[in-house]
Each structure stands twice: as structure tokens, then as C-alpha cells.
Regions:
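Glycine-rich phosphate/pyrophosphate-binding loop regions near the starts of catalytic domains
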Residues: 23-158
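N-terminal amphipathic/basic leader segments beginning at the initiator methionine
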Residues: 2-35
Length: 158
């Protein structure tokens, strides 16, 4: 067994991911608003946050999830940091484009609701909002038996 700690050794094909994202973006470009109109994208190289025109200002948004770290949280049954991690990934993406995060929405998908787990994730998200000085403006909780096998958490920051 290899001691390598990279995407390929974990089963992730970065080249295939890149091709899939390029295909997705290529399909979406036809629906993009035109420059000079509210909501039109602003191209800023190197950023993970999306920028759009918003009158005389720019609005920045970022979406990210906790990813494979949720497998660790599930294995050790510790949820106290997953909301903070989710917020941090999103806030960091906005800071990278020079934006100040002001609001956040979350998306939690589970195979079956668990009030104790939901309370712990909620407490973690509340702490994350406090740390980032961001308002939790809403979110979605989806019970998806047969579609997801363990909790998934993602969010969008504005």
C-alpha cells in the first residue's frame, strides 16, 4: 500500500473532475446574463468566489461543503466543528476576492433525521456565524434515504 497522501491515491481523478467542471461551465455559459446587467458575472482570475454585477457594486458568493471530513465526524460521532469548517471554507473563498461576508445559508442532507446530530451541527453553525460575524439567513434540511448514506453539509456565503 502506498503512503502517498494525494487525491489520486484516495480515488479522486483530478483530470476527470476538471473535464466535468469544464463541461458544466460550457453548458451554463449560454444562460449567463450579459455584461452591464444586474447579475452579470465578473471574471476575476484565481478566485473561488463568484462575483456578479449589482448596480454600481459587486456582489460576491461562494458555495462549498465540508466534504470527506464528514466521514471522520461520522466515524467519531463528533459534530462540533463541521459547521465551523463549512463556514470557514466559504468565508475564505470570499475573502480571497476581497469581499466581506455578511450572510450564509446552509444545506444539510441526511439519510434519516437525528435531533442530537442536528443540534450539534446547529450549535457549530451558530458558533461559525459568531466567529465570522455573518448572519445565518436560512437553509435547507433534506431527508434523503436511499440517496445519501451519511450526513452531508454545505453552504453558500454572500
Amino acid at each position: 500500500m502506498s503512503d502517498s497522501m494525494d487525491y489520486a491515491s484516495s480515488g479522486v481523478d483530478i483530470d476527470l473532475e476538471g473535464a466535468a467542471v469544464a463541461s458544466l461551465i460550457g453548458s451554463l455559459q449560454r444562460s449567463t446574463r450579459k455584461p452591464g446587467t444586474p447579475g452579470a458575472p465578473v471574471d476575476l482570475p484565481g478566485g473561488f468566489g463568484g462575483l456578479i454585477e449589482f448596480g454600481s457594486h459587486l456582489l460576491a458568493m461562494a458555495t462549498d461543503g465540508v466534504g470527506s471530513k464528514l466521514q471522520i465526524a461520522t466515524a467519531v460521532k463528533q459534530w462540533g466543528s463541521v459547521g465551523i469548517d463549512c463556514m470557514a471554507m466559504n468565508v475564505n473563498d470570499l475573502l480571497c476576492v476581497g469581499a466581506e461576508p455578511i450572510a450564509f445559508v446552509d444545506y444539510i442532507a441526511v439519510p434519516k433525521p437525528d435531533p442530537e446530530v442536528h443540534a450539534a451541527v446547529g450549535a457549530s453553525l451558530a458558533k461559525a456565524c459568531e466567529l465570522a460575524n455573518v448572519t445565518l439567513a436560512g437553509g435547507e434540511t433534506a431527508s434523503l434515504p436511499g440517496i445519501v448514506t451519511e450526513l452531508d453539509l454545505s453552504g453558500t456565503a454572500l
